[in-house]
Amino acid sequence: MCSSDLFNERNLKFTSWAVGKALELNPAAGRAMAESGHEVASHGYRWINYKDFTLEQELDHIRKAFSAIEKSAGKPPVGWYTGRFGKNTLKAVVQHGGILYSSDSYNDDLPYWVKVEATPHLVIPYTLEVNDMKFAVPPGFSQGDGWLQAMTDAFDILYAEGARSPKMMSVGIHCRLAGRPSRAATLARFLDYVASKPKVWVATREQIARHWMKVHPAK
């Protein structure tokens, strides 16, 4: 099954990192996610390493990614996560405009503001700690039990700390990995565990960004 079905069945929303070229080839995917109320954010135009791209080359790919997502999902993205970013990525994202936040950062647990050429920009950090990609790279998860233990341990610590101050947990999942039957069962158990706890907000990154901008605006 596709892991998105597990979210839809529980009326939970997620952020999808969509590669622009992929949506050009399969526009129905973006449409289906948008119609289900999920956020379709950008994962770049191509699944390539951008380290050697010039600023203008990155801007060109950002424009193409925006166009592909808007045509597929019905509106342009407000979130950006290249993953294979280069030295010009953040500057290009801010110069292009229209992006509320980016996530090419792994250095904090909460959103924070940076200035890019004097322009305030919100960063919502990402994490690979409990990412299902660890099923595909060593050393990682070999069975669903290990993934479930890692997710619940991380959640429990953050939930306890959240009684004193805000906390955020990110879980990266991929249909080709977490969508496998045994792993989908693990994800379902984790979603049910999270849903059983009071005062937990399962939010898209756009929702987090808008909340942070309202409560903690750039100074």
Kindly give the residue locations of the regions a language model identified.
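Active-site-proximal beta-alpha loop/turn segments in soluble metabolic enzymes
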Residues: 133-136, 172-176
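Catalytic alpha-helical scaffold of carbohydrate-active enzymes acting on polysaccharides/glycoconjugates
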Residues: 1-123, 128, 148-171, 177-219
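Positively charged, amphipathic and often flexible ligand-engagement surfaces
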Residues: 124-146
